[in-house]
Amino acid sequence: MRIILDLQACQASSMHRGIGRYSMALALAMARNSAGHELRLVLNEDYPDSVASIRQAFDGLVPASHIHTFVTPVPAGEVDARNAWRVHAAERIRAHYLAGLRPDVVHIASLFEGLGDNVIASVPATGNSFDTAVTLYDLIPLMRKERYLGDPNMAAWYYRKLESMKRADLLLAISGSARQEGIDLLQLPPERVVNISSAVDPIFRPRVLAPDERADLLARHGVKRDFIMYTGGIDYRKNIEGLIEAYAKLPPQLRHQYQLAVVCSIRDPDRFRLERLAAKSGLAKDDLVLTGYVSDDDLISLYNCTALFVFPSLHEGFGLPALEAMACGAPVIGSNNSSIPEVIGRADAMFDPTSVDAISASMAQVLLDPARGTALREQGLAQASCFSWDVCAQRAIEAFEETHGRRSAAKRTTVAFAPVSSERKPRLAYVSPLPPVRSGIAGYSADLLPALSQHYDIELILAQDSVDDPALGTFPQHDSAWFDANAHTFDRIVYQFGNSAFHAHMFGLLERHPGMVVLHDFYLSGVISHAEPDHHLPNHYCRSLYLAHGYGALAEEKQGERAASVMAYPCNKQVLDRATGVIVHSHHAVDLARHWYGPDYAASWRVLPLVRLPPRTDTADRAQVRAQLGFAADDVITCSFGILSAPKCNDRLVKAWIDSALAHDPRCHLVFVGEIAPGRFGIALRDLIASHPRIHVTGYASTTQYQDYLAAADMAVQLRANSRGETSGAVLDCLSYGVPTIVNAHGAAAEVPAHACVRLDDAFTQDALRGALEALHGDPVLRARLSRAGAAYMQATHSREHCAALYRDAIEACMRDGAPAAEQALIASIAAIDAKVADPDLLQAAAAIATNRACGSTRQILVDIDAFALVDGAAQRERDVLMAMISQAPEGWRVEPVRRDGTGYRYARRYTLDLIGRADLQLEDAVVDAKPGDVFLSLGSDTARAIAIPPRWIARGVQDRCLAFDGAMMPMNLKERLLAALV
């Protein structure tokens, strides 16, 4: 399971209280006992200092990358009614953020937060994809409404939190008493409330103080003789008044021997009130000691020094001070109610806290009987050893497992996908080229659309004059202008993206109307480059290049040839980031995304088989087709399909065929079904082909001619190098037609099952290719086996109906679970909040949503250039160093110079573009979007670095690094120093 611990209880007002201490101790124990599970922490970025201390506490237990922070609008304290809109917006933003982390279980350490601070804790009302667990400390305010809920604002806040708690899938009670309260008062099923108990920090243990240490301790806290001790806070239910009155009823000799020390923080009004009560009860001025706050170390020493610890509370969720005192070896007596008997574990150490006489009598029994005190000390140490944070954590994790198991079992009994209602199919805009456009994607769409229309009412969005496929005549057809005006009326939008000019118009449409992207070619650099002059988009390619690949790629393009840049860089990030979901047809495309944009970037992509139609049923018999094409019945025809170009390795096939036995068999022919690409490769290939009379090139092949050659072929060879992330439809067509096919394991072809083809190594040798040709040529049995296997594979996985159903599932899953769809739902839910809102609040909410987005891309090296770059006449060496950083950025990183302004850090784009000679791009110096894992790199002293980096960035997980700018920093040795700084 992925378990997320919401530890805001360790950040704000609860941080130094019992709840904060409990939450931290339990979370640390969970981290120690989470083997087999993935544990992550979620924190509130509004408290950056506490984030740093929590990161330090979990160092070595939880990877830094698994500690997340989120941002919400502030202020959000519910005590102020003016914060109502921000509170509700913040709860929605937090829930959305948590869902984006894909947890199985979220544990909220403390739900009753946020009354006067900016902690946001709630259990969403509906639509949870994960289980929520909440720690249940007690329900004392509900049980004692007259004391705690008299203020209407407090009551409204508390009851709202109760309703949220009741929605939780699991409550982790800190005692058996608290568990029973949850079951009875919240009317919850027993299986939803689990007692995990509590424990104390190992620092609470017996210690021996030297006489002078003891004397100094007592003197510092105003204690002058042996003492009776209480700690645990000043509150009505703590019953300190009853304790003072009970102490006053002790025999005079005991009061003269023992002071009463109340050890805890105390406000002046409470101090004056308790001192008046003591005087009224007849106590001398020094009988009662109100110490005020004491450190943990002094608290432990006081526990060890006290003659008796008394815990007279009227109600507790657990009673941690009593356990701490026992763990230190103090004799402990306490109330006989709620959870306190569980903690103390001894019936004769209990008293009725509502009876002053009972409290006093119990105290006197211990103080007058040393043997009784010794027995309580020994029993207390034994009892305290029964409580363990590791055991608490193990119980909690077991409860998580059981709760998650129930959800998983429920999921297995439901249908994963609900078919679209026959009454109304969703309306889908389909943006793609279609026949007669000479594009493989056009044919692909024509094949897919009839089956996809079983699931959607489809309308075609075209950038062509007409469609000549009769099967598509019933689909409504519109141009881009119509779509711009009517896109909002569609339920779904699908874009078929490829790397040709037929897709150039889609970039603007996608920017204006986001939708599902089917990425046929991972590299889109070709179409983007050609779109600049054809669609009047100046610098479109360079802007896309920078946004996808950074200044290094931009500098390369400036210094070299555009063609080399187009070949080197995919340039597709704008399309991918704007898509509401992405479908690809090979895992190779996913691997490319991970290579270029980070290991998690394509986590939500769907890999679907490429739709291919079965062999056409009206094909005449094979001998007749071969005769029509000019071949004899016993000829052996080897075909290769597609445009002839360098990446298709056609020249290597020609050479291998000429060197093989096939070239010497007059029955054998090699046919390239396609046209030769222009350029030097094409010229050389024509000369090579001309050297043998039985090597043919058809030129552009119509659909009918293409299918005829598929029907006629005895074997096929489809090779590839320098894949651009595309999937070869020709390979699949060959298999579908039962043509034994040779491929090399490059790109998507590596995913064709080995039993269905002859698969050479990616970097195959000429001998291997020649051997494969001769093996197929000489073994009709092998050809027959491969023919059957290939056709069976295609029928099972690539049929039109099967692919259309997978399309439907992918589109609907994206609409249901995809990040863009979830963000749109979040925005809609925020817009529906029924509370007064101001424009600054809306801006805060928008900024929070943007900041909370997952990074999932290349990491940034944020170079602070204020030290030198913004000063006129900066030294050329300094500019050279920055240029070297840009060009030598380690793999997986991009260098982004940044600068400060009055509000924070901005990207120094104008400066950097001028530096690399591309000032014409005129990109905006936008606010820096710092993400976890980024590095802030300052060139200068540690002092400047410490001042410069925003604390929120540190909290977010941005690493702070300094690179000394000295004479040793030269461009030629920079990369090693840069790598060292990133470690």
Which residues fall in each region the model found?
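Carbohydrate transferase catalytic cores enriched for Leloir-type hexosyltransferases
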Residues: 1-625, 629-653, 658, 667-690, ...
